[in-house]
Amino acid sequence: MRPLAIIGPTGSGKSQLALDVAERLAGEVPAEIVNADAMQLYRGMDIGTAKLSVAARRGIPHHQLDVLNVAETATVARYQQAAAADIEAIIARGHVPIVVGGSMLHVQSLLDNWSFPATDPAVRARWEECLAELGVGELHAELARRDPAAAATILPTDGRRIVRALEVIELTGQPFAASAPRIGAAQWGTAIIGLDCDTPILDDRLAVRTDSMFERGLVEEVRVLLRAGLRDGVTAARALGYAQVLAALDAGGGAELLDDAREQTYFGTRRYVRRQRSWFRRDHRVHWCDAGATGPSDRVAMVDEALRVWRHVT
């Protein structure tokens, strides 16, 4: 069975559409959902990632949720291997895999079957020492000197990816982007639906989403995760919302600090959405749908369009 991928920026309604499509397909063929949100891989990171509760999943099987402890590092290579195995197993059962998420590297590594450059522990350790000694800003500047294109696509605060880029450049003697495959035919013949809407509409959704997370207990969730090792996590501790709350708690956790964390989470999410849009819009395989209207008839029409693309994509 050809998979369907539903991608797009945070807050565009991907999870809702995936459930609606799976329910519509149920009378014809069962569907199973494969998560492609990097932070939903973590157990206990529920409120801040808008992870669907078991009750909200409508009885539809979900994969790649709650598979890591917060102290573990979520690598794209590990995700690709595990998620691809899930998809192969779903297809073997005669079911439809629905890939859902907005983590750019995770989505593309899966759909384009990336092969990852080898690693060298000694080379990586040396760059990690440089990171510790010089700081993330100076190391990003070093990356910019060696590979300006890579530096332009990696956040100056993302020490882990900066180290990885420098490692790959040193090992291969080529720019970091040279190790990434070009966009071609999607693996398994996957049909790709992209959801997006006008920026003012999405900004309003992100504001409501952020407020809801804090009101539903994001701060307490972070406190619980700290006891589970969140501070030791290379990737989990940097997640939007969690990083901001963690910094506020470290500074004393007063109401004003937490209000500032809420505001920083909102603006950080808006910046992340811009990156998601830039990344996904360059993929010519994506069939884009306007997710601005969310009434019952609009949801039905969106399911119709997703299934039309899934049935007829070439």
Curated annotation (Swiss-Prot):
InterPro entries: Dimethylallyltransferase (IPR039657), IPT (IPR018022), P-loop_NTPase (IPR027417). Keywords: ATP-binding, Magnesium, Nucleotide-binding, Transferase, tRNA processing. It catalyses: adenosine(37) in tRNA + dimethylallyl diphosphate = N(6)-dimethylallyladenosine(37) in tRNA + diphosphate. ATP binds at residues 8-15. Signal peptide: none annotated. Its cofactor is Mg(2+). GO terms for biological process: tRNA modification. Its EC number is 2.5.1.75. Substrate binds at residues 10-15. Pfam families: IPPT (PF01715). The record marks 103, 124 as: Interaction with substrate tRNA. The keyword Mitochondrion does not apply. PANTHER family: TRNA DIMETHYLALLYLTRANSFERASE (PTHR11088:SF60). Catalyzes the transfer of a dimethylallyl group onto the adenine at position 37 in tRNAs that read codons beginning with uridine, leading to the formation of N6-(dimethylallyl)adenosine (i(6)A). Monomer. HAMAP family: IPP_trans. Belongs to the IPP transferase family. This is tRNA dimethylallyltransferase 1. It comes from Mycobacterium ulcerans (strain Agy99).
